[in-house]
Amino acid sequence: GKVVSERNAAALSLAAAQGNVIAPATGRALRAIPEQVMAFPFVHYAITINGAKVSDTRTGQALLRAEIALDTCLRLLDFVGRYDAMYDCYWNDTGWVDRSFLERVRYYNSDEEVVTLLRTTRAPVDDLKAFLREKGQPVQKVQLCFRDMAERETARAEIAAAFPEILVTSSFRNNLELNAADADKGRALLA
C-alpha cells in the first residue's frame, strides 16, 4: 500500500503551517484515500477520480465536478468495444464493471496487485451500458485495461482523436483512464 513517510508528513505539516493548502490528488474515490492521509489535521480538501471531483474532506460535500456526459460515455463504450480490453467506469464515486469482465480480470491483467485492486474496488453489474442508461447521469471516469501494450498505444491515439472532449491518461502499465477534458488535478487545485 501507499504510505507517507514520517519525513514527508513533517514536511507537509510545515508547508501547511506556512499557509499552503495541502490536498491529496488521486485517481481514487474519496473513501479509497488511505486513512493516514485523511487523518492529517491540515487536509481539508481532496481532488479525486483524476480531478472529476473536489470534496471538502470534513463534510464530504462536492465543491467541483467535471464529469463525462452520459451520451459521450455511451459513445465511448461503443467505440472501445473494438479493442481487446476490459472497461469499467466511475459513477457516483464507485467503479462499476460488467460482471463478465470481472470474471476474466486475469486475462487482461498479469499484475496481481492490479487484479486485487479491481476485484476489491469494482462493483459488478450484468450490463454496464444498460445500468448507466437507467441511472441517466454523467460519469466520472472510464478506465480500460489492455492485454496488449501496442493496442493500448493505438487506442490512446484513436480515442484522443475521436473524442477531443476527453482527456486520456494512465496510472499503471496496462491501463488508460478517460476523463472529461476539464477534469484535471491541476485545474482542480485552482478551485
Task: Kindly give the residue locations of the regions a language model identified.
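Short, acidic loop-to-helix structural element flanking the phosphoryl-transfer center
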Residues: 2-20, 65-72, 124-129, 151, ...
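Active-site phosphate-binding/coordination module
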Residues: 8-112
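Glycine-/small-residue-rich active-site loops that bind phosphorylated ligands and cofactors
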Residues: 3, 29, 147
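Conserved acidic, metal-coordinating active-site core of Asp-based
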Residues: 79, 83-86, 90-191
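Conserved SAM-binding loop
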Residues: 4, 22, 46, 144, ...
